[in-house]
């Protein structure tokens, strides 16, 4: 398992390259957007949000248990059975919460 990266742009990028390299262009695009908003808003909150979002997503990708739960939940979000779709939404929320708590630990 890839170690949990520090919450810096370079460390997050290196970790993403190891666990989900196809998302690197998305990461760069959202980083550029966050930094542009930070300048426009004269606030670091868009940058902090970007860091936390990617730290959370990398946490999911680097942990097979979370990655499997995340994929299963996403695959069932639009299930024809409303109960299955609701459970998928609940599980997706639980996975995101667990990953966010882990990166705040």
Describe the residue ranges of each PLM region.
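Amphipathic alpha-helical binding modules
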Residues: 67-105
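General structural signal for secondary-structure boundaries
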Residues: 8-11, 59, 82, 89-91
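Charge-rich, solvent-exposed alpha-helical interaction surfaces
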Residues: 15, 30, 34, 50, ...
């Amino acid at each position: 398992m890839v170690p949990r990266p520090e919450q810096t742009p370079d460390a997050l990028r290196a970790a993403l390259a190891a666990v989900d390299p196809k998302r690197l262009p998305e990461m760069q695009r959202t980083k550029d957007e966050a930094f542009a908003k930070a300048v426009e808003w004269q606030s670091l909150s868009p940058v902090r949000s970007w860091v936390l979002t990617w730290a959370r997503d990398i946490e999911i990708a680097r942990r097979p248990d979370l990655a499997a739960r995340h994929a299963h939940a996403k695959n069932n979000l639009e299930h024809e059975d409303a109960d299955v779709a609701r459970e998928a939404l609940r599980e997706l929320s639980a996975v995101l919460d667990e990953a966010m708590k882990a990166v705040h630990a």
